[in-house]
A protein has these predicted regions:
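Two-component system phosphorelay core
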Residues: 1-85, 89-146
Length: 146
């Protein structure tokens, strides 16, 4: 009788989907933890609203290319003050939407008193430039699954 409503092949397919989903979720949290400030995001959604956070992420996504372009221009011009100012803006904006890795990179860039800062700052700028899109994708994925 059950077979009439739920065939064995349907059952196997459903089990495979559940297993695949659980395997995916086992891999994803490490990405989430490295890239996102999960506690902050959960509190933000609880206090304000998920839609407000999504709107903030969209605003960040639209503004960061300009911040990065200015940061790169300041690197070329060897304008440490300008570089630090742009990195500070990125740090604040990234932190406000829970993008922990970008926030920490920007914090390093904005802190010329760090040991070997001059030797590392270009690498940090390059990493920020390379990773921001991916980090926003991870955040968007997290928000969709929250």
């Amino acid at each position: 009788m059950i077979k009439r409503f739920w065939s064995l092949s349907d059952y196997h397919h459903e089990v495979e989907e559940v297993i695949a989903h659980h395997q995916h979720m086992k891999q994803v949290p490490s990405d989430y933890d490295a890239i996102l400030d999960i506690k902050m995001l959960e509190e933000y959604i609880e206090l304000v609203d998920k839609k407000v956070l999504i709107d903030s992420v969209k605003l960040f996504e639209s503004m960061i290319p300009d911040y990065i372009a200015l940061m790169e221009a300041n690197m070329i011009a060897q304008d440490q003050k300008g570089l630090v100012e742009e990195a500070h803006k990125i740090k604040g904006a990234a932190g406000s939407v829970g993008l922990k890795r970008l926030q920490l990179l920007a914090k390093q860039i904005q802190t010329p008193t760090l040991p070997a800062w001059e030797d590392n700052v270009q690498d940090w700028v390059d990493e920020l430039k390379q990773e921001w899109r991916h980090d926003i994708e991870v955040l968007t994925d997290w928000l969709q699954n929250y």
